[in-house]
């Protein structure tokens, strides 16, 4: 396997294409609804426990979607903040209406408001919480959210109000940088204590949480994971006008703990450069991280992988991958260069990797398929290169 895209001198894990793993079939399951309906409107479940379901294809559940609001007290002298939290969840019903995110982006893979399935996990559903990108929206990575939901996970994505497709000022207020990780905390708090009588009440297992983020959501992900902030760099951004509405009270927020201890593994996708953390801030992270990038979207993942020394860090790079490989789809922005990897082919590489990593680190899955992928003895595809370094 070629390693020319990466800087020399690092430990490369040889990833072997294994015919015993059914990853080659993943793209066959990527189109259309996850389930044909059976006679009573339900979807039959595959036999066996959830950890026996192959990560290479969607799981046996349909993907439900709904939205709840979360309100929390903000630091830095700001008023209470209310944000919508989008939820994708396992269902046995694949019927009815599809969600349309921001009234613009339809999602044919999810079903609005269908009943929540009983949890296949005795302790409740494990959770993936996700942070969208700059000028994004909660449903930007809905294909990943539905993939996890099909395998029996709850997926939650807060809409980062003030930094979405319709309401982002330039320059960004400093508060956005602490609101993002606090929005994630609020989303998890909502799952821990939903409205009384809500079907989600008591159903989320908040001891088993993974976190992912796309683009600017990578900043959120590292902050949630415990990266520490460089006060000098933040002051320089304020003084230079790169961020707005800086106050002493708001700068002081970054000296507090903005991490989320419930997150047991993190997946930053399609971004690696953020000087809010300084040279050493990443090394404060104490949970495993899966850094994902596309070869056609150089964001400095190689430099970050080389620089970080204190983190259990895996770097996965997808040949032909563009910025929206981890969001709306690899070809979504219309760049002709991105056509080399179709949306469906891209999803069939990214989604199984994220699921496998979450199962390995959050659910302690050491089955042959998952451990082979995460530990490096097998691969989804020759298009995927992976590298690992221990702290």
Residue spans for each PLM region:
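Bacterial signal peptide processing site
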Residues: 29-31
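The feature captures the conserved acid-bearing segment of alpha/beta-hydrolase catalytic domains
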Residues: 241-318
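Short glycine-enriched nucleophile-adjacent loop
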Residues: 192, 218-230
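Domain-level recognition of soluble alpha/beta enzyme cores
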Residues: 37-128, 150
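Alpha/beta-hydrolase active-site loop
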Residues: 173-206, 236-238
């Amino acid at each position: 396997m070629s390693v020319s895209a990466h800087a020399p001198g690092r430990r490369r894990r040889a990833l072997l294409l294994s015919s015993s793993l059914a990853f080659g079939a993943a793209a066959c399951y990527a189109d259309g609804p996850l389930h044909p309906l059976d006679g009573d409107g339900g979807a039959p479940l595959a036999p066996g426990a959830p950890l026996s379901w192959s990560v290479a294809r969607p799981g046996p559940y349909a993907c439900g979607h709904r939205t709840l609001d979360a309100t929390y007290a903000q630091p830095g002298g700001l008023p209470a903040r209310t944000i919508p939290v989008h939820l994708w969840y396992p269902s046995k019903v694949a019927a009815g209406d599809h969600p349309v995110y921001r009234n613009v982006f339809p999602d044919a893979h999810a079903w609005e408001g269908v009943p929540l399935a009983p949890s296949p996990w005795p302790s409740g559903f494990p959770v993936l919480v996700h942070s969208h990108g700059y000028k994004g929206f909660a449903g930007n990575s809905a294909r990943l959210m539905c993939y996890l939901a099909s395998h029996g996970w709850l997926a939650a994505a807060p809409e980062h109000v003030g930094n979405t497709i319709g309401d982002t000022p330039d320059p960004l207020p400093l508060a956005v940088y602490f609101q993002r990780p606090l929005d994630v905390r609020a989303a998890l708090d909502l799952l821990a204590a939903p409205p009384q009588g809500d079907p989600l009440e008591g159903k989320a297992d908040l001891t088993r949480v993974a976190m992912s983020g796309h683009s600017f959501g990578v900043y959120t992900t590292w902050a949630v994971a415990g990266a520490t902030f460089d006060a000098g760099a933040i002051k320089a951004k304020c003084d230079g006008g790169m961020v707005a509405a800086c106050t002493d009270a708001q700068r002081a927020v970054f000296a507090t703990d903005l991490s989320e201890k419930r997150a047991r593994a993190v997946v930053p996708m399609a971004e690696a450069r953020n000087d809010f953390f300084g040279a050493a801030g990443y090394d404060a992270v104490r949970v495993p991280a899966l850094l994902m990038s596309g070869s056609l979207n150089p964001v400095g993942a190689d430099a970050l992988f080389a620089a970080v020394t204190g983190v259990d860090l895996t770097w996965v790079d997808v040949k032909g991958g563009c910025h929206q490989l981890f969001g709306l789809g690899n070809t979504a922005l219309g760049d002709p260069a991105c056509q080399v990897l179709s949306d469906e082919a891209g999803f069939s590489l990214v989604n199984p990797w994220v699921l496998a990593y979450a199962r390995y680190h959050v659910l302690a899955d050491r089955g042959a398929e998952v451990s082979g992928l995460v530990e490096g003895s097998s691969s989804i595809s020759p298009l995927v290169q992976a590298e690992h370094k221990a702290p």
